[in-house]
Every structure is written in C-alpha cells, then in structure tokens.
Regions:
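Conserved catalytic core of Hanks-type protein kinase domains
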Residues: 51-52, 64
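Conserved short beta-strand edge segments in small beta-sheet-based binding/regulatory domains
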Residues: 68-79
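A short local loop/turn or secondary-structure capping micro-motif enriched for an aromatic residue
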Residues: 13-14, 67-69
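Proline-centered flexible-loop/turn and helix-kink motifs
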Residues: 30, 66-67
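Short, electropositive alpha-helical surface patch
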Residues: 58-65
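Short active-site oxyanion
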Residues: 45-47, 70
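Short S/T/G/P-rich N-terminal loop/turn motif that feeds into the first structured element of a domain
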Residues: 1-35, 39-44, 53-56, 77-92
Length: 92
C-alpha cells in the first residue's frame, strides 16, 4: 500500500529537525520503503511517498517525530491504476 506522508512543523523546530535527521537518519521501520522525498522550498513542510504492507509498523515509525512536527499519512493509489479499475467496473 502507498502512503503520501505530509510533515509540517513550526519555524522554531527547523534546526532540531535538521540536527536529528543528520544524526539519526530517516528512522524508517523494517518493511517500509521510501519511494521519494520532497521538501517545500518555502519551509515548514515536507512530503514522502512510502510503501508498506503493514500500516501499523509504518505508523509507529512516524511517531518518532511527533515531538517536533505533525505527521499526516494518506493512503494513495496511482491514478492510472485507479482508472483501469474504474473502467473495469463500468463494464460490469
């Protein structure tokens, strides 16, 4: 399953976030694969696309950052995959 993860933080948290990320890395749990990461150039927000078959393990990993930022995880699907599924349903 794919998740789009949105991280938001207050300006005063930036330095601690950078320090922790440099020192400890991504803090990703076993069974979770990071497919991409992007940072908002305006600051205060970043995005990750991750894949995991175990939502509980994935979500427990996001808690490691909860003291510094808000973490939202949204289950997503590739649009082309969804369109193929919808097309098949329409015929049925």
């Amino acid at each position: 399953m794919l998740f789009m993860v949105i991280y938001t933080w207050e300006p005063g948290q930036r330095n601690e976030l950078v320090r922790r990320r440099i020192e400890k890395g991504k803090l990703i749990r076993e069974g979770v694969k990071v497919l991409g990461e992007w940072t908002d150039l305006g600051g205060g927000r970043a995005f990750s696309l991750v894949e995991s078959n175990d939502a509980k393990s994935f979500m427990s990993g996001t808690n490691r950052w909860g003291d510094l930022m808000k973490v939202e995880a949204v289950p997503v699907i590739d649009t082309e995959e969804l369109m193929k599924w919808a097309k098949g349903r329409k015929k049925a």
